[in-house]
A protein has these predicted regions:
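N-terminal periplasmic accessory domains that precede
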Residues: 70-73, 149-157, 197-200, 231-232, ...
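Outer-membrane beta-barrel signature, preferentially recognizing the C-terminal barrel domain
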Residues: 404, 504, 547-550, 578-632, ...
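Surface-exposed extracellular loop regions of Gram-negative outer-membrane beta-barrel proteins
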Residues: 488, 533-538, 563-612, 628-648, ...
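Short, acidic Ser/Thr/Gly-rich low-complexity loop/linker segments typical of extracellular
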Residues: 105-120
Length: 825
């Protein structure tokens, strides 16, 4: 509700609020509150929020009985009430003036209060003769003996000796610990200056430069309750609309079994009606080029309905260069010296249209249709290669392959309902996702040509229901999630491998429950359990393959305990995660990369399971986490000879399960604010101990690995902001690779324009010193050594602009179902 109250009694204001709602019943005694007067402007508040706003500093209490009854009463029952009004020398109300009543006998404190927006105060006190004292910053204190409860109008005089300017400066903590991670304040902080939510997320505590959460992998991201499906959603959301970000490093059972971290963005609650919208654009130049344009429109009705449409177009031309020095030991010893260039040329469009209706603060529903189209898709790989066989020069080859993706459109529909029935909460979502892609590859050398075509069609249906239940102690939520996936893939080729025709159908049904119990004021316990059932049918050339048609029934438990005291919070947590391999790495088709390089998937891959134990300590702006992870059947690429008789010298890359890996690590983050400088420093130290001998791999290490990220933001006058971020990954020997040092320094300068600050321009330069190379020597297979140096054109300059008008908060609350299966597709 929104309303202006002007010098009315508290009972009158409560009666007006009662007439605006059918949900709440407001109970009060008229004579108990008639001495209290209010002047206030309330905007976009619920009924309980409005009552708290009106109460202010008055000695009035508000209590809730159930979900719909509100009792309001004076908390100090006295026969006498001292009341009056404080004004300044110009006759304007003096808000927040301190009024105290003292004993005439010894000047001891009897009672006190604070004036409200209109200068009024009411102080319950049964003593009939008091000393009244009024103090107000910048004005002379007033002291007199009062014998009547009616203190009248008190006019204050300015203090001629008041300092002309006094600045009281403090620093609000940018984040605080939550039961499952960190809550970060965005609104009013330096993070608000980064333009889009996509850019802002990179500067959150614990988030590394590649967008992963330190030690917890790639996060799922939600805007309010809606799962983000594509990066353009984050580009469309402006940081001025974001209230806070919660970084969840211990996700509960309501999340899919492969979700190891979550970032939930909460938007500012705003009210309004009519049209609103935004424009966003970005142009970036590197060795390639990137151009993105985005627009969104929303029309809101007074009854809480929203109609929205969004559109996005992107033109991406990526360039990657690499040199390699590889060796294969088979019947003969083969050495390859190569120079490779990748040229990616893609054009995309995105659009969605939807409707949602926030009926009241207990019920909302909506539906969205989304489409993502590929207008152009082309990848060109050129490779100049010199080949030696047993130390003698064998050939010089110029390889070239061009893969073209035909124009296509993927479609998705999401519908949801979020509401409360009595004390029960309900969150329901249903989804459909469908895609159809055709691609053709043509390539080879001057001596021979090859070709292949791939046709893939995927359909996903899913639904998810979460219920929160009332409990005598603690909180309980439970639910179920169901998904069905039907995927067909046809691969034909010109003779370098074999044709494949695969149909894979997967049905997943899960039950889950979360329970959290506070023990006293300092200790919190939580437990969650997910039962996941999977049925797979794998058909090859129209016939079921029993060896690949697996059924799984697994329990996924999670436990945590947190203790908070004196600004410190300590958490001990255990979690189980389960990952199904993506459909792309389960393909059995053999793809041509060059004359001596093929790649394929592995339909025999087993699901991966990770057991994770962690200890986390948070104090003010400091976070430390130590962890241990035990991983079974992790996925890794594997290289070996393809066919030493028919295709001598060809290396094929596929995927295998690693029997076990043990990871140990410590993550440190510190995010203090010092004047205009906002520091966000993250350091990681970790070991990886993999059991690779059973796979036939002979070279592997488990030495210390480190990563460092120093993120500096400077809040400057006149709405300017500067950010400089440095990342460093030192030389390390871990797993099957020896990796050389990589580093990057990025600079960004932003300025907000217009009185409303609705226009923002940003200039940025990434990898200024051209040092972000990937350079390593790896032994990731049997009798294969790979040395390469690759640069992904991360050095670039760009300009970004954002303009929004009549900004209102999105009310869409759909959470999306079947997220794990859609990510696999």
């Amino acid at each position: 509700m929104s309303h202006n109250f002007r010098n009315v009694t508290m009972p009158t204001a409560l009666q007006q609020l009662g007439s605006m709602t059918h949900r709440y019943t407001i109970n009060f005694i008229y004579n108990d509150l008639e001495d209290f007067r209010v002047t206030a402007s309330v905007r976009g508040a619920s009924i309980p929020e409005a009552i708290r706003h009106l109460i202010g500093f008055y000695p009035i209490s508000m209590t809730m009985v159930g979900d719909s009854i509100i009792n309001v009463e004076c908390s100090q029952k006295t026969a006498l009430r001292y009341k009056g009004r404080v004004i300044d020398e110009k006759g304007e109300p003096a808000e927040y003036a301190n009024v105290v009543l003292l004993s005439p006998a010894d000047s001891s404190f009897l009672a006190g209060g604070v004036s409200n927006e209109s200068g009024y105060f009411v102080i319950p006190c049964n003593v009939r003769r008091v000393i009244a004292k009024v103090t107000y910053v910048g004005y002379k204190s007033k002291l007199w003996t009062a014998t009547s409860p009616d203190l009248g109008t008190i006019r204050l005089q300015a203090d001629r000796y008041t300092l002309k300017g006094v600045t009281v400066q403090g620093h609000r903590l940018s984040y605080k610990p939550s039961p499952n991670g960190l809550n970060v304040i965005v609104k009013g902080s330096q993070l608000e200056q980064f333009g889009s939510a996509k850019e802002m997320i990179k500067h959150l505590p614990l988030v590394m430069g590649d967008g992963t959460v330190a030690g917890h992998g790639t996060p799922q991201i939600y805007i309010n309750n809606k799962l983000v499906r594509d990066a353009s959603e984050l580009e469309r959301l402006q940081t001025a609309e974001v209230l806070s970000a919660e970084i969840i490093t211990r996700p509960g059972a309501e999340y899919a079994s492969d979700v190891t971290s979550v970032i939930r963005l909460k938007t500012v609650r705003r009210q309004g009606e009519g049209w609103s919208g935004s424009l966003w654009g970005n142009v970036e130049k590197s060795k390639g080029m990137l151009a993105i344009a985005n627009t969104s429109l929303n029309y809101r009705l007074r009854n809480g309905m929203d109609f929205f449409i969004r559109a996005n177009a992107a033109d991406s031309k990526g360039r990657i260069t690499a040199t390699s020095n590889d060796q294969l030991k088979a019947t003969d010893t083969w050495d390859y010296h190569s120079h490779i260039k990748w040229r990616n040329d893609y054009k995309f469009i995105y659009g969605d249209v939807g409707w949602n209706w926030e009926i009241n603060d207990r019920h909302s529903l909506g539906i969205t249709y989304s489409a993502i189209g590929t207008i152009k898709g082309k990848r060109t790989i050129t490779k100049t290669e010199q080949v030696w066989r047993n130390g003698e020069h064998f050939s010089d080859d110029d390889n070239r392959s061009v893969t073209k993706t035909q124009p296509n459109l993927s479609n998705s529909i999401n519908t949801y309902y979020v509401g409360r029935l009595g004390k029960w909460g309900i969150d329901f979502s249903a989804d459909y996702y469908g895609s159809h892609t055709d691609s053709e590859m043509a390539g080879g050398t001057d001596d021979a040509s090859v070709g292949s075509s791939t046709n893939t069609r995927s359909d996903l249906w899913a639904e998810k229901l979460t219920v929160s239940a009332p409990m005598p102690a603690g909180t309980l939520s439970f639910g179920e999630e169901t998904s069905y996936t039907n995927r067909k893939a046809d691969f034909t080729q010109s003779g370098f491998s074999a044709d494949t025709h695969i149909r894979q159908r997967t049905a997943i049904w899960s039950l889950y429950a979360d329970y959290a119990l506070p023990v006293g004021k300092k200790l919190n316990l939580s437990a969650s359990l997910r039962l996941q059932n999977e049925h797979n049918r794998y058909d090859v050339d129209g016939k079921k393959d029993d060896e690949l048609s697996h059924d799984y029934h697994v329990l996924i438990p999670k436990l945590s305990m947190s203790y908070a005291d004196g600004g410190w919070q300590h958490s001990l947590a255990f979690a189980t995660y389960r990952y199904n391999p993506s459909y792309s790495i389960m393909s059995s088709s053999v793809n041509y990369r060059s004359k001596y390089e093929y790649d394929t998937g592995n339909p025999f891959l087993q699901p991966m399971t990770k057991y994770y134990l962690s200890w986390t300590t948070v104090w003010k702006w400091l976070t430390v986490e130590a962890y241990y992870a035990y991983i079974k059947n992790s996925f890794r690429t594997f290289q070996t000879a393809y066919d030493d008789v028919s295709h001598p010298g060809v290396i094929i890359t596929d995927y295998r399960n690693t029997p076990k890996i043990q990871n140990y690590g410590v993550t440190l983050n510190t995010s203090p604010t010092i004047g205009i400088w906002h520091l966000n420093y993250t350091a990681r130290l970790f070991f990886s101990d993999a059991d690779l001998a059973p796979m036939g791999i002979t070279h592997y290490w488990n030495e210390l690995c480190t990563q460092f990220r120093l993120d500096n933001t400077f809040t400057l006058p006149y709405n300017w902001t500067a950010n400089i971020t440095a990342s460093l990954t030192p030389y390390n020997k871990s797993d099957v690779a020896i990796t050389k040092t990589a580093a990057s320094v990025d600079l960004r300068i932003s300025k907000k324009w217009l009185k409303s600050k609705n226009l923002q321009l940003s200039l940025y330069a990434n990898d200024i010193f051209h040092t972000n190379y990937k350079e390593m020597t790896a032994y990731g297979g049997i009798n294969v050594r790979t040395q390469f140096k690759e640069y992904d054109s991360t050095q670039c300059v760009g300009i970004e602009f954002t303009y929004s008008f009549n900004t209102v908060r999105s009310r869409y609350k759909g959470t999306r179902a079947g997220s794990e299966e859609k990510n696999r597709l």
